[in-house]
Amino acid sequence: MVRKLVQSFLFIALFFVSCNTRQKQKAKPSFLSAKEVVRLNQVVYKSTIAESLSQYSPEFEAVFIPEAINGNFAFIAKKKETEQYALVIRGSVIEFSNEGFQNFVMQDFNIFTIKSWPYTDTIQQAYVSNGAWIGFQNLLQLRDKSSGLTIKEFIEQKIPVEASFVITGHSLGGNLAYPMAGYLKNELPAEKGGNLQLITFGAPAVGNAAFVKDMEEKFPSAERYTTDKDIATVFPDMDKVREIAHITGLDSVLQLSKLSIPGINKLKTSDLLDIAGEILKATKVINETNRYVQSQRHLRLLTVDAAAVPADTSYTAESLFNRAYQFHKVDRYADLLGVNPLE
């Protein structure tokens, strides 16, 4: 009798241990943190991803590396010891020279035409900028050099169901992370679409209020990091651009009467921004339906000390964009999250 009781006890104990082990094995890992993925957003601008991860983030490995298409590039990183993944979308390469920042605002960020966004659940009349649509289409074409798979195919075929997956990007990479995340959430099987998270840094607005509402429903806990002095994140809202220009001192730097711009004399900063705003309205980019907005639910606001970026009193166009760049660069966001700049 005693022997049978002991055997029964051992059987029950082993059963509970086995169940507990299976539960642990099936437990979904947490999402990578903003601090972890901002480091990956620094790495994505390096020319050699695998080597840069080994040097700067040895706890990660690159499992998906494609060739860039029309300047758009992204890679998938995996934390070696866990099933935690991130799709890291590169921003505009040209912004990483101070002189190139103006190209990012005036040329790369193609906002003057809009595109209907089809990957919503119940939301109607969602639109994104034409620039975001073009970049998103390029991302869909990326194929891993090793497996030949697209991003969606790689997630479906190579990433375990229980894995966590963050879509992230800085600047235009963050801009493109929004449509890419919305697309994956909509198109992946439910068991994988439920394991997605969205984290961006310094991302300009992507689309209208309907697009943002759909993204907030899909990703209620997404994190959109911006600083209080980053003009890129409020463009093309000219009222907010004017406000940040004043806070950062850009309005004092942008003294157009002192700039070497043919045909422009004694034009105030506020006049320039008013003209830009009128252009956006005249082209019907801004109206009640299609006004570009950012998610306030996703917002994670970081504060920058303006004194950390001394003003340049040379009053040149270069000095204006250089100062804006200093508040927008990925290393600024990394620093605010406690991550060192890369060499």
Task: Briefly describe each language-model feature range.
Residues 1-28:
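Bacterial Sec-dependent N-terminal signal peptides
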Residues 94, 148, 152, 184-186, ...:
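Short regulatory "switch" loops immediately downstream of catalytic or recognition motifs
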Residues 212-343:
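Lipolytic serine-hydrolase domain surface
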